[in-house]
Amino acid sequence: MSAGPTCEKPCFQVCGGGHLDRHLWLQAAPVMGRTNAARQTVSTGGVAANIASHLAAAGGAVRFTGVQPPQEAPAMVTRLAASGVDATILPLEGEVPGYSAVMGPDGELLVGAAAMALYDDVLPAMIMPHLDPTAALVIDVNFPEDVVLALARSGASGRPVFAAGTSVGKVARLRPCLQHLHALVLNRDEAAALSGNSDAPVDVLAQDLALVLADGGVVLVSDGGATAALASRTGSVTLEPPQLRVVNANGAGDAMAASLFSGLVTDPGMALATRLQIALAAGADFAAGPPHPDLAEPS
């Protein structure tokens, strides 16, 4: 796979959700019905925007295309530029998108709230003219199914198309896209929902989905601190993620996805086992430390 002949660096076009994430980190076990002491981080969020920032941090030349209400667009461009991402934020009237999460003292998500109605109004005609046609394309599933499918089909030009699951509720939008994808990263719940096989182990889920991807495509299925799997049409490997004290589990999957996608472009001949090990290490590094400096700012 190639990122495109015009790029001196590995070149990526990322498209999807880009908004503000607010994380409230509880300092002790939650007490319902009471005010709980917490610290807050405000970050550039959205699966696609997070992956874009990780790809840029790894040395990629990254372009991002997303939407915001007109008054919010300049600030999002500035935030992504600070992470090394060249952003095109298209104006779209509507509610400001955002995500808020309450995290337990163990670093695990307690409850999240997503206000994403703006993304439901995105149309293919708004997005497609603003994409770099030569770069490897990375998408999430925040936009409607017809937009996601149009993005996936753009791989017919010869560039690789990579996708990351966004939520169990949205992952079905990928079903008509699978044959166009060269890599797919999901958690276990998303993979089970997409395959319709809730009882299968992660290696079976990954292998079944890999069989319907584009030729040479790979599927990574993670399961938190349990076994993860990476599969192609011809085989699969499993690995236990590194054992660690979790500080920030929310967002580790985006770091893992970025690592896999970057490696597919920069080293297409890498063995599956090595790819999985590197991707899991990237997710573990994110989960074990404070929010990535390019992704979060104390507030």
Where are the model-predicted features located?
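Gly/Ala-rich phosphate-binding loop of Rossmann-like dinucleotide-binding domains
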Residues: A56-A57, A156, V265
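Conserved phosphate-donor
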Residues: A183-V185, E190, L205-P241
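Beta-strand->loop->alpha-helix junctions that form or flank phosphate-binding loops
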Residues: T41, T65-P70, D86-P97, A164, ...
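Charged C-terminal helix
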Residues: S2-P10, A28, T78-S83, A87, ...
